């Protein structure tokens, strides 16, 4: 899976509405103009939450969950945090827009169920994610990409996964593994948004279009982590309900069906990080922020 996520440079004390886009390209699926590059925009949406959570005295109620604007040390990436095993009972995939929308929304609900215990353990919010299969005229993230640029994208400003049915079907047909891989990856960006990882990354950006070598490396760490988070969720659902072990494995392989990219990582690393989540089964397996530069090339 490929995806070009543009993260805005630091905008002072604002939490940015990150516009995350993921394009899924697979070997054997022809696309005009080759692999689609992804673009994104970001808008300030709210004042930042502090990354220092209040320490509650012994015997008092647990602090209210809040995002933590940290990267390598984000509580979500602590040792021992795992997703819940889930049984995803999905409807039949279809070219009918209403039925495909139901397929995506049902899977997104299953992903939310898998991720909630991990977010609870980190005391971070399980923000609701919306799935929309039509393009908005405007959104909290500004101008939307064209079909030539993306297959699906995530907007952190309105916590919405946009997966236009025409774009998705044109790219993936009815190949369930590719639809699942795309949605799991996009939901991975939603988890980054919920936890504060995206906001923390945004604060580190220094170049106007995130095109400096250092900023591109940060973008790769975001993208590769979304692959890992996506595969982590696939593993949590594998072998139960509508997601057989073989289907989950095929979805995992999708993350390696791409080209090398200076904003998304090498083909090898894109698959490597997905496998890290699928096999490791804990969020700490997805700590791209603690990885060496060569591991996120």
Please give the residue ranges for each predicted region.
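Pan-zinc metallopeptidase signature
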Residues: 254-297
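Post-HEXXH active-site segment of zinc metalloproteases
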Residues: 193-219
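N-terminal low-structure segments adjacent to metalloprotease catalytic domains
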Residues: 1-78
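Post-HExxH zinc-binding segment in Zn-dependent metallohydrolases
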Residues: 210-239
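Acidic/histidine-rich, surface-exposed loop or edge segments in extracytoplasmic proteins
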Residues: 82-101
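Auxiliary, metal-adjacent structural segments of Zn-dependent hydrolase domains
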Residues: 103-158, 220
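Active-site recognition of the HExxH zinc-binding catalytic motif
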Residues: 115, 181-196, 226-227
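Short pre-active-site segment immediately N-terminal to the catalytic Zn-binding motif
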Residues: 165-182, 216-218
């Amino acid at each position: 899976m490929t995806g070009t996520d543009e993260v805005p440079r630091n905008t002072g004390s604002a939490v940015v509405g990150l516009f995350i886009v993921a394009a899924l390209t697979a070997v054997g699926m022809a696309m005009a103009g080759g692999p689609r590059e992804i673009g994104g925009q970001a808008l300030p949406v709210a004042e930042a939450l502090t990354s220092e959570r209040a320490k509650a005295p012994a015997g008092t109620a647990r602090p209210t969950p809040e995002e933590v604007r940290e990267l390598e040390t984000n509580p979500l990436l602590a040792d021992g945090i795992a997703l819940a095993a889930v049984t995803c009972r999905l409807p039949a995939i279809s070219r009918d827009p209403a039925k495909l929308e139901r397929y995506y929304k049902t899977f997104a609900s299953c992903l939310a169920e898998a991720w909630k215990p991990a977010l609870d353990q980190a005391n971070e919010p399980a923000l609701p994610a919306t799935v929309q299969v039509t393009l908005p005229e405007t959104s909290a993230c500004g101008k939307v990409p064209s079909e030539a640029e993306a297959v699906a994208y995530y907007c952190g400003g309105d916590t919405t996964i946009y997966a236009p049915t025409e774009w998705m079907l044109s790219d993936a047909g009815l190949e369930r593994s590719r639809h699942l891989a795309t949605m799991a990856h996009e939901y991975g960006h939603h988890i980054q948004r919920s936890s504060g990882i995206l906001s923390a990354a945004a604060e580190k950006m220094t170049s106007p279009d995130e095109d400096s070598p250092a900023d591109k490396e940060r973008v790769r760490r975001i993208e590769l982590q979304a692959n890992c988070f996506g595969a982590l969720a696939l593993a949590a659902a594998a072998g139960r309900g509508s997601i057989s072990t073989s289907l989950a494995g095929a979805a995992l392989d999708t993350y390696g069906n791409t080209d090398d990219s200076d904003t998304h990582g090498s083909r090898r690393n894109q698959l490597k990080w997905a496998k890290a989540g699928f096999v490791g089964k804990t969020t700490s397996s997805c700590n791209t922020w603690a990885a060496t530069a060569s591991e996120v090339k």
